[in-house]
Amino acid sequence: MAENAGNAAIFCDLAGTLVRMDETRQLPLDARGNVIVELLPGVAEKLSPLRDHLIFVITNQAGIKRGRLTRKSVEAAIAELDRKLGDILSGWEICPHDDADQCACRKPKGGMIAELAQTFGVDLTSSLMVGDQEVDEQAARAAGVGRFVYAKDFFGWK
């Protein structure tokens, strides 16, 4: 693992942190089944000035396993998010599994964070995770991320 490689990073959850979720806490879809990417308030304003940092998206998407989404549609949504943010993302990890799979990548486990840290030489103890749920905080802790901040506090939501 690359905990001491020297590069701090910002890890962000996707739905409910960077983009809007639907009423079932899933990524919203249009009539053709494409993910609707609607930035949440303050996201672009807060993240765009941080473009000199490594910024990653990590997301649980059990809808892939269940057939509601495809990996390609989630990747397209993250690419659209990146365009809306001004091409600031360094990378992303998607967990397509559900809880029954007991995989190492699904939050609250830290596998997605650890994978990105190893690939990009991230110093996890100097890094930050932003998320909207307790599983995000647990994943940050499991991976050894130095600081966790809830999205409402990071982006200044009421």
Where are these regions (language model features)?
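Active-site neighborhood of HAD-like aspartate-dependent phosphohydrolases
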Residues: 1-56
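Asp-based, Mg2+/Mn2+-dependent phosphohydrolase catalytic module
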Residues: 2-10, 49-51, 72-75, 79-91, ...
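Hydrophobic alpha-helical segments that mediate membrane insertion or helix-helix packing
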Residues: 16, 59, 139-140
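Conserved protein kinase catalytic core
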Residues: 19-21, 66, 138
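A short acidic, helix-capping loop that chelates divalent metal ions and anchors anionic groups
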Residues: 27-30, 64-68, 98-103
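Acidic beta-strand-to-loop metal/phosphate-binding motif
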Residues: 57-60, 128-130
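A short secondary-structure junction motif
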Residues: 60-74
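Beta-strand-loop-alpha "switch" segments that mediate conformational coupling across diverse proteins
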Residues: 95
